[in-house]
């Protein structure tokens, strides 16, 4: 499984136009608030796994008063996040580093909270990552995750077509599978919340945006061919979201 540089610069810029500056996943500040709900983040040390270009980390620092360490597999994303942290005057609260697939490079009990938006979606060996999160958390700490998921039925032709259009590494599972894996890793007070209805409406809005007012910007950034591919990719995603085959959800657990 090779995740190296799946997101090139212009693609990142397009995602920011759709999802907001610094964000490579939907929901913006609202998604960050949902991830941190009930965790008392002020003054806490948070690990953001799959931090991308740092938008969620900056929000956690500015609005929620946390100290944040962000990690990602892709060095260009980390370089951008580090540069933006300096520019925003948040380099004292936010630091970023590139990591490889495998054990997290942190001592046991390093973090009060661990968050992720999509890291488990793109990880085949979810059990190992959950075990690492458990190890890196302090007792009483939380792991809070927002992920793209699947329904229980076999993938349709529409789903296979969307995977082809995406060209990214996905390892989708059902919401109940996440809940079971969190519990198997030793987490307590596990909760799993379906967010599919929320993102169904968001995806429709995003599709209208990229085939409408953002289209000319996409052509300038990506060229005609890639812009049209981007629009078709989003159309294909809306199809599998509308059918209920591609789903979204939150899962949270607490270390004993």
Regions found by a protein language model. Name each.
Residues 113-125:
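A short SAM/SAH-binding and catalytic strip from SAM-dependent methyltransferases
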Residues 191-256:
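Conserved Class I S-adenosyl-L-methionine
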Residues 47, 53-103:
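Class I SAM-dependent methyltransferase SAM/SAH-binding core
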Residues 148-169:
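Short, glycine-/aromatic-enriched active-site segment of Class I SAM-dependent methyltransferases
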Residues 127-142:
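A short glycine-rich, Lys/Arg-flanked "PGG" loop and its adjoining helix->strand segment in the class I
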Residues 25-42:
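Conserved alpha-helix/loop element of class I SAM-dependent methyltransferases that forms part
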Residues 171-185:
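Short alpha-helix
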Residues 102-113:
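A short acidic, Gly/Pro-enriched loop at the edge of an enzyme's catalytic core
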